[in-house]
């Protein structure tokens, strides 16, 4: 690996034919040139950064014209990797763009590092504490919080989080964090964010195969994404009150673990029969959504690495969006477009809510065998725990959170996608 700083420049001219047809990068005695086309320039920069990193170049300087905020960020998205050290000398930016870049580097890199962390190093309580630390680093005066842990969850009737997490030696945790920059303890809550924080998912007694378990340190991606989104919105100047609920647990196999056929009784009166212990994310989110509904906020967003079905539909490039509220769903898609992130809305209809039949409880935690729309029925399950589910509620199935292997735009591991979109939406809603 070279220790010299390599200059990286942008060009709208094609590379010399010696570099091959439509070559993305070329080199000369001045450094590396990225050759942009009129189509998907940010994606081209990100792919070029992956190529540069793959050549062992770890210290670079962004030189010449064209390096604005989004170009610089696209380079970092591709250049960054989960191991080894990299450094970038950034091009000069206007003060506001420099500040935004620094905020993204602090917050979205935190999200990626947190999702990439080994499960042994990041249990439920540590995830909650790390989330508090991030938000305190951004706006500590506006932050207060409560951690409910272990047997206290059972006593306070957080039945989903407690049931899922009781099989682990590491106690389950609910973090309820209040971001209130108004200084008024009676200020209305503009939004509630509810994140799935399963710090390792073995599948429980519905045990995963190794090929599906090896990435399950990342099953807390929804919690990390929403924590980062609130932090970025706060850094960008959010002045409205937002509550964050992180539903954190390990899903393990033990003599104390929950079993197929068990019935969970929730605080809102719903009963749920367990027919698959690997459909645990929705069980912990239900507790957070009940709390969120009690705040009477006009906006509730939950995010979770919830289903393989969403990845089957969209791959790892798009996050899946579900909502009964067309106007709100479009607002999030508009925010995603503004932030150069990819979301795709998938179906969620009233009839999906009846596709979770149980012989012994009001709901089953998985859809009946005749109903194969797994991502839609998972979203429908969650809707039973949102008081006003038809308006003001968004569910994000985080299919783009993590990649098991590198591709042309991304290294292996966490992407940080979704943080900017949710932050943008929070700020847009605050202006209404």
From Swiss-Prot:
Annotated Pfam families: DUF3663 (PF12404), Peptidase_M17 (PF00883)
Reactions catalysed: Release of an N-terminal amino acid, Xaa, from a peptide or arylamide. Xaa is preferably Glu or Asp but may be other amino acids, including Leu, Met, His, Cys and Gln
Active-site annotation: 208, 282
Alphabetized InterPro entries for the sequence: Leucine_aapep/pepB (IPR011356), M17_PepB-like_N (IPR047620), Pept_M17_PepB (IPR008330), Peptidase_M17_C (IPR000819)
Sequence positions that bind Mn(2+) 1: 201, 278, 280
GO terms for MF: manganese ion binding; metalloaminopeptidase activity
Subcellular location: Cytoplasm
Cofactor-binding details, from the entry: Binds 2 manganese ions per subunit.
Primary enzyme class: hydrolase
Cofactor: Mn(2+)
NCBIfam families cross-referenced by the UniProt entry: PRK05015.1 (NF003450)
Function: Probably plays an important role in intracellular peptide degradation.
Subunit structure, interactors included: Homohexamer.
Protein's name in the database: Peptidase B
Organism name: Yersinia pseudotuberculosis serotype IB (strain PB1/+)
Gene (UniProt): pepB
């Amino acid at each position: 690996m070279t220790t010299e700083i390599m200059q990286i420049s942008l060009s709208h001219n094609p590379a010399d034919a010696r570099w091959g047809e439509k070559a993305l990068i070329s080199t000369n005695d001045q450094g590396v040139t990225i050759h942009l086309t009129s189509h998907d320039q940010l994606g081209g920069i990100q792919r070029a950064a992956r190529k540069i990193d793959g050549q062992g170049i770890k210290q670079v300087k962004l030189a010449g014209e064209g390096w604005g905020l989004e170009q610089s960020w696209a380079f970092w998205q591709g250049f960054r990797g989960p191991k080894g050290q990299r450094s970038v000398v950034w091009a000069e930016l206007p003060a506001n763009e420099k500040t935004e870049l620094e905020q993204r580097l602090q917050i979205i890199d935190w999200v990626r590092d947190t999702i990439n962390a080994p499960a042994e190093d990041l249990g439920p309580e540590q995830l909650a504490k790390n989330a508090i630390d991030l938000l305190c680093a951004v706006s500590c005066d506006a932050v207060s919080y409560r951690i409910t842990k272990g047997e206290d969850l059972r006593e306070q009737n957080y039945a989903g989080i407690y049931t899922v997490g009781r099989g682990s030696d590491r106690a389950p945790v609910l973090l309820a964090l209040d971001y209130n920059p108004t200084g008024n303890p009676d200020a209305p809550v503009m939004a509630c964010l509810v994140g799935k924080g399963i710090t390792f998912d073995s599948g429980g007694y519905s045990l995963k195969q190794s090929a599906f378990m090896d990435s399950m340190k990342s099953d807390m991606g929804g919690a990390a994404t929403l924590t980062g989104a609130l932090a970025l919105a706060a850094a960008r100047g959010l002045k409205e009150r937002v509550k964050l609920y992180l539903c954190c647990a390990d899903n393990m196999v033990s003599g104390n673990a929950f079993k197929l056929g068990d019935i969970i009784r929730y605080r809102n009166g719903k009963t749920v029969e367990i027919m698959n212990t690997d459909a645990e994310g929705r069980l912990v989110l239900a507790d957070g959504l009940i709390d969120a509904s009690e705040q009477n906020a006009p906006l509730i967003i939950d995010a979770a690495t919830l289903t393989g079905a969403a990845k089957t539909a969209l791959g790892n490039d798009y996050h899946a969006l579900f909502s009964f509220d067309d106007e709100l769903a479009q607002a999030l898609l508009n925010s995603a477009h503004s932030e150069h992130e990819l979301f795709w809305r998938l179906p969620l209809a009233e009839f999906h809510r009846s596709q979770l039949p149980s012989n012994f409880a009001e709901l089953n935690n998985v859809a009946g065998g005749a109903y194969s729309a797994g991502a839609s029925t998972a979203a429908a399950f969650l809707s039973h725990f949102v008081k006003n589910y038809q308006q003001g509620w968004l569910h994000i199935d985080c299919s783009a959170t993590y990649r098991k292997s590198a591709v042309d735009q991304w290294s292996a591991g966490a992407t940080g996608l979704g943080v900017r979109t949710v932050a943008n939406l929070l700020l847009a809603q605050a202006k209404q």
